[in-house]
A protein has these predicted regions:
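A glycosyltransferase accessory/donor-loop signature
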Residues: 2-144
């Protein structure tokens, strides 16, 4: 009988020689197991975009009405309250139609998030919020 992909993954993860060459355990193992078994589909089914691109002076936003699935990459996600950009609107629209529609967007819960929150606040012309979040960032870095 053919070994299942899950069993192969567990077996490979138990092999120290294989694991020593992996950077991202789950992704790398799947890439090895599925090598040659993958069908590449149109990018509209996995459009990747970082909301931190919004911090740049200029960037190309690949999100449009043709996109089926957006994979928000990077530390800032559309469920963060500081991700207030048109590029986050597909998520907000889906959230509003979901059982989580009344849940608040996430506030910064660690120093890394506080730093990104402050950067986005300044980009969005919210300097008071930016200063407050930089103070919070330093508090989390120094005190905690």
């Amino acid at each position: 009988a053919q070994e299942s992909d899950s069993a192969k993954a567990m077996s490979m993860l138990a092999d120290k020689a294989i694991v020593s060459h992996l950077t991202y355990m789950d992704q790398d193992i799947l890439n090895l197991i599925l090598l040659g078994k993958v069908k590449f589909i149109d990018a509209k089914y996995n459009t990747q975009f970082s909301l931190n691109y919004e911090l740049k002076k200029s960037f190309v936003c690949p999100i449009n009405d043709e996109i089926v699935l957006i994979h928000y990459v990077g530390p800032t996600k559309p469920w963060h309250y500081w991700a207030s950009y048109p590029s986050a609107q597909p998520f907000i629209k889906a959230k509003e139609a979901s059982p989580w529609k009344n849940e608040p967007l996430m506030r910064p819960v660690n120093s890394n998030y506080a730093r990104y929150c402050a950067k986005h606040n300044f980009k969005q012309n919210k300097p008071i919020n930016g200063i407050m979040n930089y103070i919070y960032y330093f508090y989390l870095k120094i005190i905690k």
